[in-house]
Swiss-Prot record:
The protein's name in its UniProt record: Dihydrolipoyllysine-residue succinyltransferase component of 2-oxoglutarate dehydrogenase complex, mitochondrial
Gene: Dlst
Annotated transit peptide: 1-68
Biased composition (Pro residues): 171-197
N6-lipoyllysine sites (modified residues): 111
Keywords: Acetylation, Acyltransferase, Lipoyl, Mitochondrion, Nucleus, Phosphoprotein, Transferase, Transit peptide, Tricarboxylic acid cycle
Functional summary from the UniProt entry: Dihydrolipoamide succinyltransferase (E2) component of the 2-oxoglutarate dehydrogenase complex. The 2-oxoglutarate dehydrogenase complex catalyzes the overall conversion of 2-oxoglutarate to succinyl-CoA and CO(2). The 2-oxoglutarate dehydrogenase complex is mainly active in the mitochondrion. A fraction of the 2-oxoglutarate dehydrogenase complex also localizes in the nucleus and is required for lysine succinylation of histones: associates with KAT2A on chromatin and provides succinyl-CoA to histone succinyltransferase KAT2A.
Length: 454
């Protein structure tokens, strides 16, 4: 009796294990006949068959891994030290299914926008911050229920196949009967009576339709309001602070672009073939600015108003202004003094592409010791840029236009560009500013100055 009980238990465990290993749907299954064989160590045990009449029925439940149904809370990512808070703009709503790394919301800070992706596949259960609400680093944003599988993409509905039966061909219509040939001339029609006319005195003038009001013809005059985004608010605040803090002064000069245009036209194909980059004018001005900043380090310095000290930087990080739909951003090219033209062009292209795609990180815009703004790409002729604090100067580039200039006692038409240097007159004197701008002019007009370190 003991051996039979053990064999039954062993066989039942094996059957149950086999059922559990199979990925069976929810249901009820009955064990078929279970054969119990004589096992070793039990010589007295006999073979026994348990029929289906014996109730060995097991109900199976399909289970899911615990991690698939976990509810997690996603928090605001940490910001840079110079950023304390941001505004939330939701891309998804409650109940939306999201895939891993799919953007759920965007946090707009003073300098850039930070995208918050979903950490896993799941369904959004709750939004913990309203749209447009302010959040700090580590603030809970939303809760997500993991599903373990990416949401299936909706397939386009297929048009139902309709069986069309060929319509039976209609019998051919009989030919029309032949019209009889006329044997007599048709009668000549008599002229009709002219229509009766009214006398002029009987005609009464009709009133002209009233003229439409002048206001209705021009349309309604309306206006609407939009909330300033955080980046625009920060730009306005910083520029006003710069005006209130710095004693800004602007000096001008003009640059003959003939040599740099000739150099670009001669070497642009070889430059593109070797570096896979287009050779532009921006790299020439960035390189010339680094050369001039090394000659005039005070332009690369800044006043620390808290300690009343002048901070001289031994490195050159140049901010390049880039216009985006959200506003003006200034990504930084670091250690420009160690770069060549190809390195500068590559960095400008990478930062510009990230700015247009709104993928700039805060670290890409932190720092900067000098700024270059190129209004010439929009056709600017002249302008005075505003200092980007905490810097002490900014260079403004403008459009290239053919103008008559005196060259060797003769009038020639040359491609000319106006350049402007706005600087903090509290730190930089006029002599240093003019010398700095002339260094840039010399390096751009004749790039050999950079090679010879003149």
């Amino acid at each position: 009796m003991l051996s039979r009980s053990r064999c039954v238990s062993r066989a039942f465990s094996r059957s149950l294990s086999a059922f559990q290993k199979g990925n069976c749907p929810l249901g009820r299954r009955s064990l078929p006949g279970v054969s119990l064989c004589q096992g070793p160590g039990y010589p007295d045990s006999r073979k026994m068959v348990i029929n289906n009449s014996s109730v060995f029925s097991v109900r199976f439940f399909q289970t899911t891994a615990v991690c698939k149904n976990d509810v997690i809370t996603v928090q605001t990512p940490a910001f840079a030290e110079s950023v304390t808070e941001g505004d939330v703009r939701w891309e998804k709503a409650v109940g939306d299914a999201v895939a891993e790394d799919e953007v759920v919301c965007e946090i707009e800070t003073d300098k850039t926008s930070v995208q918050v992706p979903s950490p896993a596949n799941g369904i959004i259960e709750a939004l913990l911050v309203p749209d447009g609400g302010k959040v700090e680093g580590g603030t809970p944003l939303f809760t997500l229920r993991k599903t373990g599988a990416a949401p299936a993409k909706a397939k386009p509905a297929e048009a139902p196949a309709t069986a069309y039966k060929a319509a039976p061909e209609a019998p051919a219509a009989p030919p029309p009967p032949v019209a009889p040939v006329p044997t007599q001339m048709p009668p000549v029609p008599s002229p009709s009576q002219p229509p009766s006319s009214k006398p002029v005195s009987a005609i009464k003038p009709t009133a002209a339709p009233p003229l439409a009001e002048a206001g209705a013809a021009k349309g309604l005059r309306s206006e609407h309001r939009e909330k300033m985004n955080r980046m625009r608010q920060r730009i306005a605040q910083r520029l006003k602070e710069a005006q209130n803090t710095c004693a800004m002064l602007t000096t001008f000069n003009e640059v003959d672009m003939s040599n740099i245009q000739e150099m670009r036209a001669r070497h642009k194909d070889a430059f593109l073939k070797k570096h896979n980059l287009k050779l532009g004018f921006m790299s020439a001005f960035v390189k010339a600015s680094a050369f001039a900043l090394q000659e005039q380090p005070v332009v690369n310095a800044v006043i620390d108003d808290a300690t009343k000290e002048v901070v001289y930087r031994d490195y050159i990080d140049i901010s390049v202004a880039v216009a985006t739909p959200r506003g003006l951003v200034v990504p930084v090219i670091r250690n420009v003094e160690t770069m060549n033209y190809a390195d500068i062009e590559r960095t400008i292209n990478e930062l510009g592409e990230k700015a247009r795609k709104n993928e700039l990180a805060i670290e890409d815009m932190d720092g900067g010791t000098f700024t270059i703004s190129n209004g010439g790409v929009f056709g600017s002729l002249f302008g005075t840029p505003i200092i980007n604090p905490p810097q002490s100067a900014i260079l403004g580039m403008h459009g290239i236009f053919d103008r008559p200039v005196a060259v060797g006692g003769k009038v020639e038409v040359r491609p000319m560009m106006y350049v402007a240097l706005t600087y903090d007159h509290r730190l930089i004197d006029g002599r240093e500013a003019v010398t700095f701008l002339r260094k840039i002019k010399a390096a751009v007009e004749d790039p050999r100055v950079l090679l010879l370190d003149l």
